């Protein structure tokens, strides 16, 4: 293999921001954040959904509005529901 053309493959901590679940795996992701886990410093990749918080894996239905989409929809359309929706 050629030297210097491949990304750095290293151990990274992925942290689920909705459930505070984290796991260590190997990745080439580039991050500026770091975290100390098990006495060692790792790069930190923040994710919104993992197997610990996804409804398919947990079996529970949960509304996750991380980007404010529901409020944006309500501001745009308000309570203008049709007769069929009531």
UniProtKB/Swiss-Prot annotation:
Gene Ontology BP terms: translation
UniProt entry keywords in alphabetical sequence: Ribonucleoprotein, Ribosomal protein
InterPro entries from the UniProt entry: Ribosomal_bL28/bL31-like_sf, Ribosomal_bL31, Ribosomal_bL31_B, Ribosomal_bL31_sf
GO molecular function, one term: structural constituent of ribosome
Alphabetical list of Gene3D superfamilies matching this protein: Ribosomal protein L31
GO CC entries: ribonucleoprotein complex; ribosome
NCBIfam families noted in UniProt: L31, PRK01678.1
Assembly and binders: Part of the 50S ribosomal subunit.
HAMAP family: Ribosomal_bL31_2
Family (UniProt): Belongs to the bacterial ribosomal protein bL31 family. Type B subfamily.
Protein's name in the database: Large ribosomal subunit protein bL31B
Lineage: Bacteria, Pseudomonadati, Pseudomonadota, Betaproteobacteria, Burkholderiales
């Amino acid at each position: 293999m050629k030297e210097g053309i491949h990304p750095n493959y290293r151990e990274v901590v992925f942290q689920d921001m909705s459930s505070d679940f984290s796991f260590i795996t190997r990745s080439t992701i580039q991050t500026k954040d770091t975290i100390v886990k098990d006495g060692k410093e790792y790069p930190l990749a923040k994710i919104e959904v993992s197997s610990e918080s996804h409804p398919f894996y947990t079996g529970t239905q949960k509304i996750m509005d991380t980007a404010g989409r529901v409020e944006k929809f309500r501001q745009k359309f308000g309570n203008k529901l049709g007769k069929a929706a009531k």
